[in-house]
Structures are given as structure tokens and as C-alpha cells.
């Protein structure tokens, strides 16, 4: 009986040792394979940034440039009962993509202090949302809001900024702008008509005289939305434009760095108006045009 028990114990120990040895050999093989793969990885040599460095160039570069009237028609339809978007939803989507694009192009170590000029309309609302997201991303953000809106939506956006400790000021002079690394122009969007009036004409002049890098939201403020020879004499001279929904005719020949943000046009609208929308890569909410 004792011999049989000893034999069983010996056989069981031998089996366990075989299992341990097999596991060790598999682990060693995995380690060698992993080291070989790591040695073949090339270091990323792109510009230093605190945002993801995935490609945002579209493989389908055909894009529809919207007239002012068509942009307004589509915008109204997006917020109709039939489609179902709200102004708040569109602002959040637009503002997030604006912040993500800025984060991609303007690294936190060089452009930490950001001043955002927000206008009285929805373009300004997009700027208020972008300010909050940039604060999330680590930027030191200030909002200049010359004509504060009293609508509940805008007051809620301002209240959020208070809770994020984002300063909101009435104006900013040329001397004030010297304190910032980047200026964002969210004064006027596609609904703007005519010439900029006070205080916005002075603000545009101050921005252009600052020699700071400037990013415009949707169109450089003061631009004639339909383009052509009737372009306004006074408009923001930005180095990058972030179009929303689809680019407008006024920036067809922009000629500088140009992104499309706000990935919110449903298939039904694309088909109804025969729109050409660039292909967004993966889960990106923006694409470089």
C-alpha cells in the first residue's frame, strides 16, 4: 500500500514538473518574440504634441463649399423636429473638435496661454465650449466676451466656465494680447453679413496688429461668407481656419492650414443636398482639408 502511494505521488510530481517546464518555455518564447518586435519599432519623429498624432488627412478630398443660404438651410434642418439635433448638441460637438484641433496643432509647452474672442452668436457659443475643453487639456484659457448673451444656453456655458476657473473679460487691448501665446477668433460665423461694427471692428484690428498666431472658427471674422470680389476690407488675418459642418464659399481660396470639424451631418442630409463630405479617419471628429 505504501509503495503504491509513493509511486502515485512520484508520478504526480513528475507531471507537475512537466507542466511547469512547458509553461516556462512558452513564457521564454513570448519574451524573446516581444523583444524582437520592440527592436523593430521606429521612434515617432513628428512634432511634439500633447494630443494623439494619428493621421487626419482625408482619403476623399472632394468637399462641398456651402453658400451662406445653403449653410443656413442645413443648419435649420439639423435642428428641426425631423432630424432632432439641439443647439446645445451642435455647440458641444463643434467646440470639442475646435479644442482637439488646437491641441493637435499648438503644443501645450509652447502655446499654453490662450485668449478666445467670443462673439454674440452661436459662433461665440462654440468658442465658449472650446474654452472649457482646452481647460480640460491643460491650457491656461481666458475668454474675451464683449457682448454677453442673456439666453439661458449662453448663461449656462458661462456658469460652467466659472466652475472651471476660466476668466471671462469684457475686452482685451493690444497690451493684453502680449500676455498670450495663441488667439482664437470665434467672433462671427456663417450668418454674419455686412461690415463689422463697433466694438468688433476695433477687436479685429487689435487681433491683426498683435502679431500673434490666430485660429479662426468657421470663417475668419469679417469675411464675406459667399466670397467673390465683395470680400470685406476688414477681416481677421488668421493662420489657420477651422470650418464647421462644411467649409463656406468665403474660405474656398483660404490658402493656409484648414481643418473641418464638427462631425455631425447625417446621411439623410448628405443625400438630400448631394453634399461631398470628406472621409473622417476612424473616431476622429475632424479632418485636415
UniProtKB/Swiss-Prot annotation:
Keyword Cytoplasm on entry: no
Entry's cofactor comment: Binds 1 potassium ion per subunit.
Location of the YjeF N-terminal domain: 71-277
Pfam families according to UniProt: YjeF_N
Protein keywords: Isomerase, Metal-binding, NAD, NADP, Nucleotide-binding, Potassium
Catalytic activity: (6R)-NADHX = (6S)-NADHX; (6R)-NADPHX = (6S)-NADPHX
Co-factor(s): K(+)
GO cellular component: mitochondrion
Superkingdom of origin: Eukaryota
Binding site residues for (6S)-NADPHX: 122-126, 189-195, 218
Molecular function terms, GO-annotated: metal ion binding; NAD(P)HX epimerase activity; nucleotide binding
InterPro entries: YjeF_N_dom, YjeF_N_dom_sf, YJEFN_prot_NAXE-like
NCBIfam families per UniProt: yjeF_nterm
Function of the protein: Catalyzes the epimerization of the S- and R-forms of NAD(P)HX, a damaged form of NAD(P)H that is a result of enzymatic or heat-dependent hydration. This is a prerequisite for the S-specific NAD(P)H-hydrate dehydratase to allow the repair of both epimers of NAD(P)HX.
Protein name per UniProt: NAD(P)H-hydrate epimerase
Amino acid at each position: 500500500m505504501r509503495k503504491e502511494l509513493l509511486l502515485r505521488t512520484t508520478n504526480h510530481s513528475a507531471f507537475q514538473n512537466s507542466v511547469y517546464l512547458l509553461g516556462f518555455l512558452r513564457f521564454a518564447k513570448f519574451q524573446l518574440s516581444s523583444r524582437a518586435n520592440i527592436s523593430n519599432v521606429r521612434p515617432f519623429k513628428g512634432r511634439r504634441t500633447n494630443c494623439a498624432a494619428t493621421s487626419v488627412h482625408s482619403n476623399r478630398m472632394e468637399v462641398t463649399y456651402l453658400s451662406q443660404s445653403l449653410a443656413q438651410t442645413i443648419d435649420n434642418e439639423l435642428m428641426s423636429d425631423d432630424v432632432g439635433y439641439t443647439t446645445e448638441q451642435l455647440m458641444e460637438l463643434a467646440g470639442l473638435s475646435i479644442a482637439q484641433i488646437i491641441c493637435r496643432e499648438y503644443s501645450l509647452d509652447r502655446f499654453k496661454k490662450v485668449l478666445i474672442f467670443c462673439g454674440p452668436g452661436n459662433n461665440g457659443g462654440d468658442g465658449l465650449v472650446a474654452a472649457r475643453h482646452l481647460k480640460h487639456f491643460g491650457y491656461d484659457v481666458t475668454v474675451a466676451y464683449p457682448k454677453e448673451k442673456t439666453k439661458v444656453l449662453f448663461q449656462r456655458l458661462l456658469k460652467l466656465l466659472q466652475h472651471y476657473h476660466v476668466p471671462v473679460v469684457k475686452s482685451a487691448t493690444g497690451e493684453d494680447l502680449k500676455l498670450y501665446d495663441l488667439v482664437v477668433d470665434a467672433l462671427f460665423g456663417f450668418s454674419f453679413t455686412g461690415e463689422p461694427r463697433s466694438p468688433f471692428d476695433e477687436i479685429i484690428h487689435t487681433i491683426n496688429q498683435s502679431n500673434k498666431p490666430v485660429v479662426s472658427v468657421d470663417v475668419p471674422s469679417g469675411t464675406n461668407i459667399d466670397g467673390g470680389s465683395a470680400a470685406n476690407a476688414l477681416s481677421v488675418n488668421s493662420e489657420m481656419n477651422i470650418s464647421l459642418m462644411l467649409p463656406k464659399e468665403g474660405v474656398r481660396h483660404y490658402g493656409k492650414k484648414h481643418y473641418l470639424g464638427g462631425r455631425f451631418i447625417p446621411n439623410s442630409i448628405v443625400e438630400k443636398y448631394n453634399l461631398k463630405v470628406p472621409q473622417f479617419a476612424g473616431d476622429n471628429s475632424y479632418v485636415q482639408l
